[in-house]
UniProtKB/Swiss-Prot annotation:
Keywords tagged on the record: Amino-acid biosynthesis, Cell inner membrane, Cell membrane, Cysteine biosynthesis, Membrane, Sulfate transport, Transmembrane, Transmembrane helix, Transport
Organism: Escherichia coli (strain 55989 / EAEC)
Protein name: Sulfate transporter CysZ
Domain of life: Bacteria
Function: High affinity, high specificity proton-dependent sulfate transporter, which mediates sulfate uptake. Provides the sulfur source for the cysteine synthesis pathway.
Subcellular compartments: Cell inner membrane
Disulfide bonds: none
Major localization class: membrane
Length: 253
């Protein structure tokens, strides 16, 4: 099926919605199974454990609130919960993406071929195995870019007042951008586009990518829905690649 997508500007919300539609397309579902299983096992177990710990972690986090802000505690408590969900959700989402990276790349490749009618390179289990070292190197590049920035934001959580008010907002914006990078990178990497060049390309449509990443981040925090978010986000990001970036960066057509 050749895509009916156009180059007309679309919002990140549109591409996120497209991900939910594309993930169930005939011929694509079989490439969704492995990423979906990885996400269900890891995110399902992680969030079950998280919800058993919230009654311990939230009071600890609230203990950093200074006395002069105690009158706002009824507002800060939900922010503290959201903060924990954001950090925890992104952390385990990153682990799940590491484990499923080769299969996410294959899903992006097959969906792109279906949307465009292009012929991808010959792939299969041996092709995936051959690409694993390169794919893991790319994941390390993303992690190296992410880690120092995440550490700075996590330190902000320890500053009384700021940690319970400003830090959650900054973390949400950061995680939105990082999740856009994470999922958009699969089709870019399939075409051997360097990591730095990929980030530069995403910045040309920063609002679209922030919208896409923000919705992905929100759904990562929602129990049950977060079990399906990885393949959905891969499909949505691939649709965005086809519309917005493929003409300039594609290696195979």
């Amino acid at each position: 099926m050749v895509s009916s997508f156009t180059s007309a500007p679309r919002s990140g919300f549109y591409y996120f919605a497209q991900g939910w539609k594309l993930v169930s397309q005939p011929g694509i579902r079989r490439f969704v199974i492995l990423p979906l299983l990885v996400n269900i096992l890891l995110m399902g177990g992680a969030f079950w454990w998280l919800f058993t710990q919230l009654d311990v972690w939230i009071p600890t986090l609230m203990s950093y609130v200074p006395d002069w802000l105690q009158w706002l505690s009824y507002l800060l408590w939900p922010l503290a919960v959201i903060s924990v969900l954001l950090v925890f959700g992104y952390f385990f989402s990153t682990i799940a993406n590491w484990i499923a990276a080769p299969f996410n790349g294959l899903l992006a490749e097959q969906l792109e071929a279906r949307l465009t009618g292009a012929t991808p390179p010959d792939t299969g289990i041996f092709g995936i195995m051959k690409d694993v070292p390169r794919i893991m190197k790319r994941e390390w590049q993303k992690f190296a870019w992410y880690l120092p920035r995440a550490i700075v934001l996590l330190i902000l959580y320890l500053i009384p007042g700021i940690g319970q008010t400003v830090a959650p907002v900054l973390w949400f914006l950061f995680s939105a951008w990082m999740l856009a990078i994470q999922y958009c990178d699969y089709p870019f990497d399939n075409h051997k586009v360097p990591f730095k060049e990929m980030r530069t390309a995403l910045r040309t449509r920063k609002i679209t990518n922030m919208q896409f990443g923000a919705l992905t981040s929100l759904f990562t925090m929602i129990p049950l829905l977060n079990l399906f978010i990885m393949p959905v986000a891969v499909c949505g990001a691939t649709a965005m690649w086809v519309d917005c970036y493929r003409d300039k960066h594609a290696m195979w057509r």
